[in-house]
From Swiss-Prot:
Component of the small ribosomal subunit. Mature ribosomes consist of a small (40S) and a large (60S) subunit. The 40S subunit contains about 33 different proteins and 1 molecule of RNA (18S). The 60S subunit contains about 49 different proteins and 3 molecules of RNA (25S, 5.8S and 5S). Keywords: Cytoplasm, Ribonucleoprotein, Ribosomal protein. Its main location: cytoplasm. This is Small ribosomal subunit protein eS1. Coiled coil: none annotated. PROSITE patterns: RIBOSOMAL_S3AE. GO terms for biological process: translation. The gene is cyc07. Belongs to the eukaryotic ribosomal protein eS1 family. The keyword Chaperone does not apply. The keyword Cytoplasm applies.
């Protein structure tokens, strides 16, 4: 019989079993607040590890991007096909203040728009708002039959497509460059830009289902807490002003006697 260690006999581990720790014990919940351009400001909650040493919780939350359905923000199920991206800009107490960071369509909505016998026309343009945000806007539209048309198809000619695309770019640039980001987001919700494009291109070729399908923020200005508070509607000139206590209250407090003293 060979003398040596029997490898089958398991050796006891040092320290024994480790206690199962709850991963949420060292984390805190924060409320996500949307800009006041949307009807519902309470988006939801997010988790972050508590402040430990040099790791500050609020710094870990900044620049987080949240994707929210516009139907939840507006309380309207008809807007469920739009996805709004919000980026955390600042943390105040347990509230995470966000700002608009982009918009997109759901895949099923885009696929439902594409059909036979019509021409798809797309355009995109880089624009700069009055508050120095640089955005890239993508537009999509489809041709439709003219009034009293018997022909099944409604294809546009190449020259007409170029004219329509030129109009799309022109309207998107004019609409975005004449307002700030907050006002521009307010235009995206009711699709007022899409309706204007439909009206402007009706003389070239009638269009239907014209949407600003995607918006990307390419460049943002330097962070300004004052502008962020204006976007959230919580900004006022009386922030940090010391309030004097009414004289009547102080007099009443002085006259009160303790019973049984």
């Amino acid at each position: 019989m060979a003398v040596g260690k029997n490898k089958r006999i398991s050796k006891g581990k040092k320290g024994g079993k480790k206690k199962a720790t709850d991963p949420f014990a060292k984390k805190d919940w924060y409320d996500i607040k949307a800009p006041n351009v949307f009807q519902n400001k309470n988006v939801g909650k997010t988790l972050v590890s508590r402040t430990q040493g040099t790791k500050i919780a609020s710094e870990g939350l900044k620049h987080r991007v949240f994707e929210v359905c516009l139907a939840d923000l507006q309380g309207d199920e008809d807007q469920a096909y739009r996805k709004i991206r919000l980026r955390a800009e600042d943390v105040q107490g347990k509230n995470v203040l966000t700002n608009f960071y982009g918009m997109d369509f759901t895949t099923d909505k885009l696929r439902s728009l594409v059909r036979k016998w019509q021409t798809l026309i797309e355009a995109h343009v880089d624009v700069k708002t009055t508050d120095s945000y640089t955005l890239r806007m993508f537009c999509i539209g489809f041709t439709k039959k003219r009034a009293n048309q018997q022909k099944r198809t409604c294809y546009a000619q190449s020259s007409q497509i170029r004219q329509i695309r030129r109009k799309m770019v022109e309207i998107m640039r004019n609409q975005a460059s004449s307002c700030d980001l907050k006002e521009l987001v307010a235009k995206f919700i009711p699709e007022s830009i899409g309706r204007e494009i439909e009206k402007a291109t009706s003389s070239i070729f009638p269009l239907q289902n014209v949407f600003i399908r995607k918006v990307k923020i390419l460049k943002a200005p330097k962070f300004d807490i004052g502008k962020l508070m204006e976007v959230h509607g919580d900004y006022s000139e009386d922030v940090g002003v010391k309030l004097e206590r009414p004289i009547e209250e102080t007099m009443v407090e002085g006259e009160t006697e303790v019973v049984g003293a």
